[in-house]
């Protein structure tokens, strides 16, 4: 149900191939069996899922990998409640919550409310164009 909400919301924002969610669901099921993945959801009193997230665990980190909000969840602060519940459930553990960063300033600001700090990642870009074109493109 959590992955279905993510899938529904992603349809509005991201261009993902139809099979991507099926592959992710299989990966999630495998990792869940190994206790390396979990989902969190926030429900209304009527039982409607209004916020959902998938967390993956590796190397003393919990990755906030997939998240979605129903429009009602945004107005009710459901994402705040979801992340807060995750933090409370894992308090005192040797675990760092990694929000996977964001180039969107409003998301970075939201994450900073939970104590998130910016982390720089090194990257290498290989230019495999033929020599004359390689020098033109810099």
Regions found by a protein language model. Name each.
Residues 32-35, 90-94:
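A structural signal for short coil/turn segments at secondary-structure junctions
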Residues 91-138:
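Active-site/acyl-donor-binding loops of N-acyltransferases
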